């Protein structure tokens, strides 16, 4: 029997026929405003509720802002951080400013994947993390797209080796058909694509599981909403593509 990690996101585990296979690295891919970050934070929060420690690697936002954004949905990670069950790896401030001086896990040069890897390893070992989010992995290779696949592989080797189930947030432009970076889709175990489409003058959210190693899954596109408690997916309302 394959061990699975429950996302805890309403509707998602049904679509994945029980959850994400343990140790999988899953790309959460989509354009701006599609809900990628909320999806990832909800995954971490639900893990904490199930007793699974988590790490959030912040590459695009100040760690203080990450926590504020989570609190909007009632996800207060401070108690878990104090208990050593949750940590934010600060790969945003570059070690500048008073916040960074207090921060335990800081990556000073995001162009140095080895430094990120070392900080990440230490954070995972010290918190005994089972879930990891990197938001966004695109930031690591935006200036050197040819390195995208190699960077994904390096991080995958480390995180899978440490027993973590991980979500890598990947940005794509609104019109882009791919998943954000050349070859990244081959370096991950799963891809969940989030979309925001204009239909009859109204924006509609939907997602589709493009691939997921180790499990069967729904092949349909499913509508979802962002509520005051986070993302809710409607697994029985699969539309037939766009």
Curated annotation (Swiss-Prot):
Limits of the KaiC domain: 3-242
Pfam families per the UniProt record, alphabetical: ATPase
Keyword Magnesium belongs to the record: no
Keyword tags: ATP-binding, Nucleotide-binding
GO molecular-function term, one example from the UniProt record: ATP binding
PROSITE patterns found in the cross-reference section: KAIC
Leader sequence segment: none
InterPro entries associated with the record: KaiC-like_dom, KaiC_dom, P-loop_NTPase, UPF0273_KaiC-like
Claim: Transmembrane is one of the keywords in the record: no
S-S bonds: none
Residues that coordinate or bind ATP: 30-37
Family in the record: Belongs to the UPF0273 family.
Alphabetical list of PANTHER family matching this protein: UPF0273 PROTEIN TM_0370
Name listed for the protein in its UniProt record: UPF0273 protein TM_0370
Organism: Thermotoga maritima (strain ATCC 43589 / DSM 3109 / JCM 10099 / NBRC 100826 / MSB8)
């Amino acid at each position: 029997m394959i061990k699975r990690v429950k996302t805890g996101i309403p509707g998602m585990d049904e679509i994945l026929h029980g959850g994400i296979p343990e140790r999988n690295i899953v790309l959460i891919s989509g354009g701006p405003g599609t809900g990628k970050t909320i999806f990832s934070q909800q995954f971490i929060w639900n893990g904490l509720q199930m007793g699974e420690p988590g790490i959030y690697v912040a590459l695009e936002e100040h760690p203080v802002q990450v926590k504020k954004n989570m609190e909007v949905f009632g996800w207060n990670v401070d108690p878990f951080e104090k208990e050593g069950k949750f940590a934010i790896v600060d790969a945003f401030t570059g070690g500048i400013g008073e916040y960074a001086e207090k921060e335990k896990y800081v990556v000073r040069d995001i162009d140095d994947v080895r430094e990120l890897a070392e900080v990440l390893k230490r954070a995972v070992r010290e918190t005994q993390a089972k879930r990891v989010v990197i938001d966004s992995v695109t930031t690591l290779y935006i200036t050197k797209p040819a390195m995208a696949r190699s960077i994904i592989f390096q991080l995958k080797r480390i995180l899978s080796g440490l027993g973590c189930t991980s979500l890598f947030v990947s940005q794509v432009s609104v019109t882009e058909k791919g998943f954000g970076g050349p070859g990244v889709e081959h370096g991950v175990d799963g891809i969940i694509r989030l979309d925001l489409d204009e239909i009859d003058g109204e924006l509609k959210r939907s997602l589709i599981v493009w691939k997921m190693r180790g499990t069967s899954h729904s092949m349909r596109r499913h509508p979802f909403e962002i509520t005051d408690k986070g993302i809710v997916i409607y697994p029985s309302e699969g539309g037939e593509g766009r």
